[in-house]
């Protein structure tokens, strides 16, 4: 397991609501990212621009890291990355905007699926009981 803190950052604030509501549970990244992310790894999910302050949305655990070609993307892959998209063409257009370069069906991508880590509510005393106010 890799040490240190890793981040999955999203550049658009549009994703904040989708992330918080659990509608966005994956990210599709251009290239093979399997050397950076692995199943079971804990990461911070953040939003912000490169070289700028970023907002931590939540901590997450990586459920799956799958390297494949763009042409092998499933509808499920696409919908988990962006609930508004249904077609590979939509995803390709999006990737081209993010990476500022053409993306072909033969390009390698990495689908990273993640689940939010929900923090337990703070106990009042440590024994789970609510303090009485007599």
Region annotations inferred by a language model:
Residues 1-134:
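Structured alpha/beta reader/binder surfaces that contact nucleic acids or chromatin modification marks
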């Amino acid at each position: 397991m890799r040490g240190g803190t890793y981040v999955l950052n999203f550049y658009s604030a549009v994703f904040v609501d989708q992330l918080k509501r659990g509608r966005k549970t994956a990210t599709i990244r251009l290239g093979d990212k399997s050397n950076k992310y692995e199943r079971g790894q804990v990461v911070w999910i953040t939003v912000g621009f490169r070289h700028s302050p970023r907002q931590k949305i939540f901590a997450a655990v990586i459920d799956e890291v799958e390297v494949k070609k763009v042409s092998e993307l499933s509808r499920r892959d696409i919908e988990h990355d962006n609930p508004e998209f249904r077609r590979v063409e939509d995803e390709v257009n999006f990737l081209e905007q993010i990476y500022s370069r053409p993306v072909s069906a033969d390009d390698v991508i990495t689908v990273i699926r993640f689940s939010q880590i929900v923090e337990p509510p703070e106990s009042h005393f440590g024994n789970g009981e609510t303090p009485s106010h007599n």
